[in-house]
Each structure stands twice: as C-alpha cells, then as structure tokens.
Design a protein with these regions (language model features):
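Cytochrome P450
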Residues: 1-336
Length: 336
C-alpha cells in the first residue's frame, strides 16, 4: 500500500513539474491508489479533484448535467460571469447551447468536407516530409511539426498563405512562455480588459480583429473555405453572434497550430524514446491509426480539462461535492 504521505506529496499543478517531463509515475500512483484525489491548489485556499481513471473520465465527459463545462472556465482560473461570457467558446458550453453551436458549424464538417481537409493535410505533410528527406534530415520540429498544422489550418480557413506567420506569432503569444515575449496590454491596438480576452492576452484581440476582417470579406465575397461557412451558417434563422464567431475563429487558429504542433513533436519524441514501438509501426503500418490515438493520450499537449460538479455526486470511490472542481487529462488515464 502506498503511504498517504507519498500521495500527499504529489503535485501535478505546478508548471515546473512538466518542464522535467510529464509526471507519468505520479499519474500511475493516483490511478492505482487514489483515482479521485483531492489536490490542493498551490498558493490558493482551494483545490480540485484530480480524476485519473478512464471509466471515471468517460463518465464525467458524458454527464453534462452533473459535470458542467459551462459553469466555469475549462481552465482553473477565477473569472467573473461577464469575463467568462466574453471568453466563452465551444469547449465552455453545455447542451443546449453546445448543441446549437455544433449545429451551426456542422455544415463546415460534413463527410465530404472532412475528406477534402484530409487530402489537403496529406498533401502538405507529404511535401514537408519530401523536403526534409531531400535535405538528408534536419530538425523535425522546425521542418515538419511546426509548419504542418499552421499550413493546414490557414488552407482550411481560407487565410492567405502570406498571413500564416502572423497567425503563428499570435497563437504563440497565447501560450505563456512559448513566445518568450511578454506583451504590453495595449499591444496590437488592444483596449479590451485582459480579463475579457482568452489567455489574458492582447494577441486574442488581434486574432478577433483579423477574424472579423476576413469574415466581413467572406460575407460579400463567399469562397469555398471554412470562414465562409462559419459566417453564412444559419439554423432555424439563427447565426453565430460576433462573440461566438470570434471565439470560434480564435479556437480554430490556436488549436490548429499550437496544440497540434506540440502533439506531433511530443509524439515523435515518444517514439524515439521507445524504439521498440517505432519498430512495430515500421513493421506494421496498419497500427498507425491506433498509434495516433495513443500519442494523443500519452503525449497530449492538454494537461487537463476542468468540470464543475453541479450537485453532490459519487464518482468511483470518492465524493465530489456540489460546485467543486474536477480536472482530468488524456495523459493521466490508462489506455483501454
């Protein structure tokens, strides 16, 4: 039996921990011995429930009435109601609002359109891999994992290729420490309080303004791209509001660049650190689809998602009181 003091020493909330690598040993201890673990939040009087078992995380994800994504931000940050509304995107909603937003954007993700996005992605990836192979090798991050997702997302959105570096600049600024530059609150002409902007960053203001501009262009000059579908989407006479559109555009650019870039890079590192798994892939390419899912779990760029308990509830072998926060991450759970 693992001593209680060993469990109490676990700290999965400190960013410095992840600079040394994902704490898989601690995640395993929690899964095996305390899968619904009360974790104090450093420098705060409160804390959160760290949920680490697959079945519990699936249950939380499916039960939106008990575990809300909308009650608070999906990150553990303290926001006033007006701040939360200003920053709310698809991932901070529950049904029926979540259902409405999905219906509005579904025309951009039909099977035919997804097949087109897949082919565009394959073409871009093949070109980048051909280039690094012709060069005799190189830095995988700068040659493949960094340019691939941003080139894909600008192609899908309909953003001019020459604006791709600006999209990278802005999305890098959204992640503390990624760009290495702390922005002044008034950067990019921002006058919005930072608490009303995603990531507390004026780069979000710049993404909003860019999204608004290209959205206005597509309303009068529609094209076969994702922005056109977003600005013209309508269900039962309703369309996306300005706030909904801006936050959705920001989410697509950020998720289509930073998180994907990190997952690809971390996934390649994981394969290099586990050469036997790389050999399995080379020997049996049919395993690639399963490998992608495992990379997204093991090398996830997202450390956690927050849910808020809407009532006292039993979860696994623990109890989550009403209004308490639970946090779970793909790389905390065991594979199934």
């Amino acid at each position: 039996m693992v001593a209680a003091d060993r469990l109490s020493e676990i700290n999965i909330a400190d960013p410095a921990v992840y600079e040394r690598g994902v704490p898989h040993v601690d995640f395993r201890l929690l899964r095996d011995h305390d899968p619904v673990h009360w974790h104090p939040w450093p420098d705060r009087s409160s804390g959160f429930w760290a949920i680490t078992r697959h079945a519990d995380i699936v249950a939380i994800s499916r039960d939106t009435e008990t575990y809300s994504s909308a009650a608070e931000h999906v990150l553990i940050v303290d926001l006033d109601p007006d701040e939360l509304e200003a920053r709310r995107s698809l991932i901070e909603t529950d049904p029926p609002q979540h259902t409405r937003l999905r219906r509005l954007v579904s025309s951009a993700f039909t099977p035919r359109k997804v097949a087109e996005y897949e082919q565009a992605t394959r073409n871009i990836a093949a070109g980048l891999l051909d280039e690094i192979a012709a060069a005799g090798g190189g830095d995988f991050v700068s040659a493949v994992s960094a340019p691939l997702p941003i080139n894909v997302i600008v192609s899908i959105l309909g953003i001019p290729a020459e604006d791709a570096p600006f999209m990278v600049e802005l999305s890098n600024h959204l992640v503390a420490g990624t760009s290495g530059v702390r922005l002044d609150a008034a950067a990019y002409g921002n006058t919005t309080p930072l608490s009303h902007l995603p990531f507390d960053s004026p780069a979000s203001h710049a993404l909003f303004e860019y999204g608004r501009r290209i959205g206005r262009e597509r309303r009068t000059d529609p094209r076969d791209d994702l922005v056109t579908r977003l600005v013209h989407a309508e269900v039962d006479g309703e369309s996306l509001s300005d706030v909904e559109y801006c936050n959705f555009f920001q989410l697509l650019v950020f998720a289509g660049n930073e998180t994907t870039r990190t997952a690809i890079s971390q996934g390649m590192l994981a394969l290099l650190e586990n050469p036997a798994e790389l050999d399995r892939l080379e020997d049996d390419p049919a395993l690639v689809s399963k490998a992608v899912e495992e990379i997204l779990r093991w090398a996830s760029p997202i450390m956690y998602f927050r849910r808020t308990a809407m009532r006292d509830t039993e979860l696994g072998c623990g109890t989550c009181p009403e209004t308490s926060t639970s946090a779970s991450s793909p790389n905390q759970i065991g594979s199934t």
